[in-house]
Amino acid sequence: MAHLSADKRLVEAFKNNEDIHRATAAEVFGKEKDKVTPNDRRIAKVINFGLMYGMSPFGLAKNLGIGRDEAKNYINKFFARFPGVHEYMDSTRALADRQGYVETTFGRRLWLPEIHAGGARRAAAERAAINAPMQGTAADLIKLSMIAVQKWIEEKGLKSKLILQIHDELIMEVPEDEVDLVKENLPKIMDSVTELPRDQPGVF
């Protein structure tokens, strides 16, 4: 979300390696970061992930066990503090409506045949349009990482094996005498698999 929306506050939080949910809570609730409570952070986490999936005030209210007006207020505060996110969501809906699909940063397309339908079907397509560039780009990145890691294993002639991928994690089986080498190099390989373009915010 931070990369695609190019929202200044979100990008800054990631650059500073901050706890993104705590940083969001501080912005939404108008607190210093060290004053954010566990409940504040919990609410911010639900908002962060919920908005990625196009969660409505009704959905947020149900998820948090609060009133719809209170939930709407949280969402409004979030967009006020992170205007780039709101702009990204609006521009993505418009793009999907215009061309009938969205793309990941790497050009993989999700076609949205329901984007010109009415009611709930269109709403679902709009949610998919907002979410797909984020989730899809993350999926592309982890696949590129798997390819790079396997190539490195083969080039080094290691006995380590790539066993499983879960979300943004790679599970490996590593002989004891290769543990230090893998621990040192795996993060570097995954971090350097590609450089996301930064000159086209909002364009996938």
Q: Which positions does each model-derived feature cover?
A:
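Conserved catalytic core of nucleotide polymerization and phosphodiester-bond processing enzymes
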Residues: 1-204
